[in-house]
UniProtKB/Swiss-Prot annotation:
Highest rank taxon of the organism: Bacteria
Residue numbers spanned by region Domain I: 1-67
The UniProt record lists the keyword DNA damage: yes
Family listed: Belongs to the RuvA family.
Subcellular location(s) of the protein: Cytoplasm
Name this polypeptide is given: Holliday junction branch migration complex subunit RuvA
UniProt cross-references to InterPro entries, sorted A to Z: DNA_helicase_Holl-junc_RuvA_I, NA-bd_OB-fold, RuvA, RuvA_2-like, RuvA_C, RuvA_C_sf
HAMAP family membership: DNA_HJ_migration_RuvA
Organism this protein belongs to: Endomicrobium trichonymphae
Amino acid sequence: MIDYLYGTLDSKSTDGITIDVNGIGYEISVPISTFLKLPETRNPIKIYIVESTAGMYGGVISLYGFFTIEEREMYLLIKDKVHGIGAKKAMEYTDKISKSFANFKTAIISKNPSMLNEIFGFTKKTADKLIVALKDKISTVNVLNKEKQTGAETIKNTMVSEAIAGLITLGYKMQQARVAVTNVYEHNENITLEDLIKKSLQYL
């Protein structure tokens, strides 16, 4: 089982990348979200891997790569838990969700298809399908990139996301909610979630 590959980025395209590891080239499919974070070729890179086998007796092995652990965890959750979703479709969904893993998690837990539509572009049918499949399982996924976020940033991002989700539940548009919550939080960084929602409503 391959956990990650560390080597030199030999080539890259939206169809996939090749990493040279000690003279061996590994072809890896990646979502657009990972592709956009890649360095220029000939630079070192670390990619987290998912192996997939197909064909009789598992004769064909495909590698799927992700820039962060959270991208990989979300991909595996979707592929394994959402009925009828194969590897390629799971990659497509992961790319959409990578806009904000925290907001996606909040939308699933709060059973909010409108939030899934406005932020990530999922149709109502797909949003409902994701909610049913993931509502009892998504809490096990760590959506915080600990290598890049401090504790203060984590608290801020979580609170802001939850407040925005709360306003959307009350019928406000995503853009309205984001502007209100962001403006209120910038002037009240020690605020509680309940007061953040109340003051955001006053702002609106």
